[in-house]
Amino acid sequence: MGSAKSVPVTPARPPPHNKHLARVADPRSPSAGILRTPIQVESSPQPGLPAGEQLEGLKHAQDSDPRSPTLGIARTPMKTSSGDPPSPLVKQLSEVFETEDSKSNLPPEPVLPPEAPLSSELDLPLGTQLSVEEQMPPWNQTEFPSKQVFSKEEARQPTETPVASQSSDKPSRDPETPRSSGSMRNRWKPNSSKVLGRSPLTILQDDNSPGTLTLRQGKRPSPLSENVSELKEGAILGTGRLLKTGGRAWEQGQDHDKENQHFPLVES
């Protein structure tokens, strides 16, 4: 049948070795084999150190935070407020600004009402006050007469309106010029010229515009239609010699009847 010990023909391969995954504990990690930047962890403060040294170590640890995006970049130190006395220019400017602020904070001065008379006017005697009032323009006095004048003019207007309407109905004419038919005709001439203008129904023709259709443009009347009309007139009036050729009536002396000349002529 076969030997008791079976030997595979192809030698077994060793498991695949990846140099990136050699140091990884779990190769199933999604970020396996990606080299990370190592985080520098500061050592914890030792309990044997004094409190002052521990605080300094904490400050140093805060300043050199390994998680800082700008690790190792020298920063410009912040200027702390020192106790040096300010310059004289700064003192002057500060005083000016302080005075302006104090003025703006003050309440506004009370404004006197305009109707209240001034103290100087109150001190004046009655005679001087009257003289001042006389010097002032009498606005009230001028307003009352103007109102009276307007009321009088309004009263006159209704009486004048019927007279004006009567005069407007009649044509205005001078008393010197006599009224005659000739003058009336002359007066109405411009109006008649407007009426006698070109009617909108008439055809607008210019000197260059063709008045009538030429022979080429128009339809030439056929001699047959003329003969039929003449024959109708002759039959009605009973005049004219009618000829019957081939069941059709023709009039003698026509140029287009040359073909029918050999037929016998029958008088009606």
Swiss-Prot record:
One of its GO terms (cellular component) is cytosol. Residues 56-66 have a biased composition (Basic and acidic residues). Pathway: Protein modification; protein ubiquitination. Residues 91-120 are annotated as: F-box-like. Ubiquitinated and degraded by the APC/C-Cdh1 complex. Signal peptide: none annotated. The keyword Transport does not apply. Residues 128-149, 158-169, 178-194, 205-215 have a biased composition (Polar residues). The modification Phosphothreonine is found at T37, T76, T202, T212. A motif (KEN box) lies at residues 258-260. The KEN box is required for the association with the APC/C-Cdh1 complex. Interacts with SKP1. Part of a SCF (SKP1-cullin-F-box) protein ligase complex. This is Cell division cycle-associated protein 3. The gene is CDCA3.
